[in-house]
Amino acid sequence: MKILSVGAGMIGAIVAQELSRENEVTVFDANKAALDKLAAKGGSIKTEHGSVYDAEKFNAIIEANDVVVIAMPGSLAIVAADSALNLKKPVFDISSIPNEYLMNKIQPLANEKETLYVPKIGI
C-alpha cells in the first residue's frame, strides 16, 4: 500500500518508520532538516519537501498515494485533511484538530465525499 505521511516531526517520523516496514511510505513536510534527518536513517522511506499550502504540489502527492496519515499541528492538519478528503483519500489523523472544526467541517466533508476519516488517533 502507498501511504503518505504528512509531517516529519518526532511523532511523524516514528509513524513513517513503522509503516514503512510493510508499505511504501512517502513523508511530506516543509521542514527540510527534518526530512534529511529521516532520510539519513536509511530504509525505503521517500521524502518530499513542500508546504500543504502549495495545493498543486500537495494534491499531486496525495493523488499518488492510497492513504494519508496526518502527524502535524492542528492548523496545518486542517489544510491537509481538507485536501485529502476532497481527493477522496482515506485519512488517519494523529493531529489535534479542534473538536468544533472537526465536527462542523472535517467530518461532514468526509461524509459528503464518502471517505474514511479517523481523527485523533493516539490522543
Cite the ranges covered by each PLM segment.
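N-terminal Rossmann-fold NAD(P) dinucleotide-binding loop
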Residues: 12-13
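N-terminal glycine-rich "phosphate-gripper" loop used for MgATP/nucleotide binding
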Residues: 52, 66-81, 94-100
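Rossmann-fold cofactor-recognition segment
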Residues: 42-54
